[in-house]
């Protein structure tokens, strides 16, 4: 799936309607993406019903063989969906006698997200950045410290320790941008990044923010990832080419101009 020229123009028109002082044009578009929303087909005939009227709610179905299936829903309700799905599976396993009756239901709503443990109650980002400066001896700029804090919360301390042990980790992923190579290391070691696209699209969002979409950095990122993942030269090249293809797909709408 990829965005079309019609999609791009629709979003530009919507943005300019709500923010008329900005007057965005096609030239301002760096990247695009498209996907399918997993809506549940209404039981009744949709008739003239617009897609926007279809329910975004999720449903859980239990098959005759005990398979628990969840469908529909939204990204913003991911935790609630996961909890309800797991709780349903737990109840089934209890009925089958495979789990103790006193097993409690999920408590994920009480668990802080990664990086939130130890976060100051007054939400003072600069205090955490100062803590990094005091605890880790590395030549890191104030802007980089704040970037790491804004991105990783308290886990920014872990990235600063990577930099303290390896000065090359402070090098920018893309010259002139704020993201650093330590984020590549951290992405592989702690966030299951397994490809150049994982880093540039899904961990740093350079794909969406850099005018070149990080194409010039793809080789350096692959070089950084290769020893961490045990890549061969072929693996490295394959990951670079896959990223280049993803960038090309995000720009395909321009072929319609």
Model-inferred region functions:
Residues 2-257:
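C-terminal accessory subdomains/tails of enzymes that are appended
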